[in-house]
């Protein structure tokens, strides 16, 4: 990331002012502050790969910061505290009254990630630290994107293209499109490995076939008769090919949170790209490659909402910054929309608003049942995730028609059902206050150096895209996405504080 004249700018959230640097307490404070920042660095590295370990680092940072507060560290003014505390308090009450207490407690634990915004805002103390965190996040995401690209170029196994319903393998449980990854422990991820595995197991009577199926990918190991398998291979028309994931999901359990993570990092990258476009050619090309890679990986998830949100976020960023090319930005948005439509039609045989596909029908059925459940418990809801346990008792139409047991596919509807209307109101208050904060301070950010301006711009675009996607996805339930939302909120608050403090010092010096 390019260097700026303000890269060393520090805010007041460093080691406590007035301390003698030679005292033990001051040295301990510096070590603890360094440990907190190290946790932030770990979170940035882990966010695109493993949210559980990132959550552990968040808890470590929270504990260390609490010790620093008890030792006298100053608590800086923090926006959004009131709606955030009310939201968590109401969610806690809903959990206490839940129809499924165990499920609700687990979900509430993830809701506490909201505190990451506070810990980050209170402890990120310089623009240089922001740069380091962003650099680590972009590098780690690039690794994830490269892995996804490798899966599509190299493949993840050998696909059994067609298995007829009257074949023995079909009755044994194998299906067309299954991607075989190993046979009796021999890997089959490339055509060469496939041939070697068949050669090594040609005398085996029973074959333990490890294969991947469905989206998100599920891994199974089933035993089949070796002669049946070899007979199927010898029949004309039964072919195999390099197997690729139906939908990209990275290291995550599902393609939806992976798409949500890519959306946020992609818009952060785009904000930096727009901000540094005219100044640093080397950084520009690096950011272009990162953004295109993220966009391609997001396209591979075939997730309509997040693809549309990326287009909207990019258009919003261009609208804010490039007033002379607003018309061109709109035309580019329309062109991208057309390309995305063609891609979705090809990959999923549906358009953007395919109301007849199973996923859209499931979502619509859940939405239709939501008002009835909200009316029964309008104040504190049914309890977080309680529909997973009590959905059949509540006569949810989607549960009757489909085997899937899932949520209401909208953050706003989910919060109203699970936690009640007051909690939903607190959430809307929090999000509205955040957007107002970003909009108000963007006028100041326009005059910052390119790196902090680009970070702030990308976070602003990501917040807009997040709100949009929350309408039709339960984004609050995807910790992989919320980790970045709260981290970015904290960084935005820290940037405003740091650079405002720097501007005041410059004014006094003048």
What are these model-derived regions, one by one?
Residues 139, 146-157, 300-301, 318-360, ...:
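A membrane-periplasm/extracellular boundary helix in multi-pass inner-membrane enzymes
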Residues 273, 421-464:
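Hydrophobic transmembrane alpha-helices and their immediate junctions
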Residues 60-66, 267-268, 310-311, 326, ...:
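Transmembrane alpha-helices of multi-pass inner-membrane enzymes
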């Amino acid at each position: 990331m390019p260097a700026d004249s303000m890269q060393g700018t520090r805010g007041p959230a460093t080691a406590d002012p007035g301390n003698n640097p030679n005292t033990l307490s001051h040295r301990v404070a510096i070590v603890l502050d360094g440990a907190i920042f190290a946790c932030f660095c770990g979170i940035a590295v882990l966010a695109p790969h493993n949210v559980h370990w990132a959550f552990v680092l968040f808890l470590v940072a929270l504990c260390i910061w609490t010790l620093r507060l008890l030792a006298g560290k100053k608590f800086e003014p923090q926006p959004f505290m009131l709606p955030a505390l009310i939201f968590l308090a109401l969610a806690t009450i809903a959990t206490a009254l839940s129809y499924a207490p165990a499920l609700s407690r687990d979900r509430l634990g993830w809701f506490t990630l909201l505190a990451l915004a506070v810990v980050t805002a209170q402890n990120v103390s310089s623009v240089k630290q922001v740069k380091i965190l962003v650099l680590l996040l972009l590098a780690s995401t690039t690794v994830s994107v490269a892995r996804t690209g490798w899966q599509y170029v190299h493949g993840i196994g050998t696909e059994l293209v067609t298995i007829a319903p009257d074949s023995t393998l079909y009755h044994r449980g194998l299906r067309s499109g299954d991607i075989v990854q190993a046979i009796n422990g021999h890997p089959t991820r490339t055509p060469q490995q496939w041939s070697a595995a068949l050669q090594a197991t040609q005398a085996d009577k029973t074959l333990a076939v490890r294969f991947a199926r469905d989206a998100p990918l599920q891994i199974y190991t089933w035993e089949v008769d070796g002669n049946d398998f070899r007979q199927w291979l010898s029949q004309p028309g039964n072919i195999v090919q390099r197997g690729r994931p139906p939908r990209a999901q990275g290291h995550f359990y599902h393609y939806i949170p992976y798409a949500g993570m890519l959306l946020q990092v992609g818009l952060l990258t785009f904000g930096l790209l727009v901000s540094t476009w005219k100044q640093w050619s080397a950084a520009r090309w690096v950011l272009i490659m990162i953004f295109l890679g993220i966009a391609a990986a997001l396209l591979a998830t075939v997730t309509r909402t997040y693809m549309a949100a990326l287009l909207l976020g990019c258009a919003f960023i261009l609208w804010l910054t490039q007033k002379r090319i607003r018309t061109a930005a709109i035309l580019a948005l329309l062109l991208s929309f057309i390309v995305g439509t063609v891609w979705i039609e090809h990959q999923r045989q549906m358009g953007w608003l395919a109301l007849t596909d199973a996923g859209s029908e499931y979502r619509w059925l859940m939405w239709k049942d939501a008002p009835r459940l909200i009316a029964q418990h309008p104040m504190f809801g049914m309890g977080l995730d309680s529909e997973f346990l009590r959905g059949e008792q509540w006569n949810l139409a989607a549960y009757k028609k489909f085997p899937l047991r899932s949520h209401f596919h909208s953050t706003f509807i989910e919060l109203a059902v699970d936690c009640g209307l007051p909690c939903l109101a607190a959430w809307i208050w929090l999000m509205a206050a955040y957007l107002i904060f970003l909009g108000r301070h963007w006028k100041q950010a326009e005059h910052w150096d390119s790196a902090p301006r680009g970070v702030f711009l990308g976070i602003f675009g990501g917040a807009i895209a997040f709100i949009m996607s929350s309408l039709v996805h339960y984004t609050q339930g995807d910790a992989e996405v919320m980790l970045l939302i709260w981290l970015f909120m904290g960084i935005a608050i820290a940037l405003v504080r740091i650079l405002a403090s720097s501007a005041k010092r410059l004014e006094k010096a003048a």
